[in-house]
Amino acid sequence: VKTSRKDLYDFIVKELKESFSDLPTEKNESNYGRFTLWGAKALLANVYLNAEVYTGDPQWNACIQECDDIINSGKYSLDINYSDPFKAHNENSLENILVIPYDEIFATGFNYHLAALHGANQKTYDLVGSPWGAGAYKGIPQFIDTYDPDDERLNATWLGGPQYASDRTPLTGSYDLMGQPLIFVNKMPNGIFTGEAEGYRWLKYEVEMGARSELNNDLVLFRLTQVHMMKAECLLRTGKADQAASIVSMVRKRAFKEHPEKAIVSGAQLQEKSCYKYGTVENYVLTSQNQVYPEKFGRFYDELGWEFAGESYRRRDMIRFGHFTKAKWLSHEPNGDYKTVFPLPQKVVDTNPNLEQNPNYQ
């Protein structure tokens, strides 16, 4: 018999709560990269944030409580710069709560730059190894277009424009732009076939000059900004929009150092529709411009995108805001509500006759 989502949710919540008394509370070198009480509370807060999806029963106040415990502990604070949590040596971040430690020699496995960058960018960073092909980690132009041009998170997350070698020599293409200037542009024909320079590249984690094929950056799982934004969302969903706006404005402040007036948002603004222009794209043209998802708390949803782009939470956000299986973007067409749940790996199902494949994946 398959365990229900609610039973699994209850089990996870119980396990996390029972672990609290056994987990360390100090933020130090010995506990770095390990679950502390604060890492466990951040995970529990995230489970509570999505409780309505998992069980049908929202747990906004419970999420706020876990967030407040972390914030009031005084163990963490926001880094001065948006990029600081993602530096090559981000073990010094004031903000990161839980990470997976990596090292270019002793703890390998983090080589995202080889997938994100164009092969020619080897000369940009004097890399030991060459990136793979033309680069694959590209931003959807419809999303990139939602950024305020003065938002520092745009250039701190995405690599666009003319590409240069470390000596400032212009780089050239290797495929459809053979011998021509390599200029990353924010456009794609349809999301299926793209030219080698089409699409900004996700480059949130610092790539050091002379980096090897493995990086020294530690992969961030939870940071204090996320805790603040989880609390803000719960306040918004419980009718405290102005309190939520105060938190969001605080988070935005470091992204608008040159334009501090743009950091301020109101509770009313957070409840507006998303500014994302949903619809499929064909031959660079948006073919269906009338979809607007989500309509409720859409601006807050946009804020999550700008702050956490590429940090592996977007799918959950899309499901929680109710449009993962409804909206169209680039070449994506809605194709079934059942896809809010992943299929079980077929190899596992074949091995264990007691397991049932999730509905519609048979």
Residue ranges: model-predicted function:
Residues 1-5, 26-27:
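A conserved hydrophobic secondary-structure block that centers on an alpha-helix together
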Residues 170-197, 260-290:
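Charged, glycine/proline-rich intrinsically disordered loops and linkers
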Residues 163, 257, 261, 306-310:
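Intrinsically disordered or highly flexible coil/loop and linker segments, enriched in small
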Residues 8-24, 31-71, 98, 151-156, ...:
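Extended, hydrophobic/aromatic-rich amphipathic alpha-helical segments that build helical scaffolds
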Residues 160-254:
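C-terminal substrate/ligand-recognition segments
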Residues 9, 17-18, 34-186, 326-331:
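An aromatic- and glycine-enriched ligand-binding surface/loop that stacks and positions planar moieties
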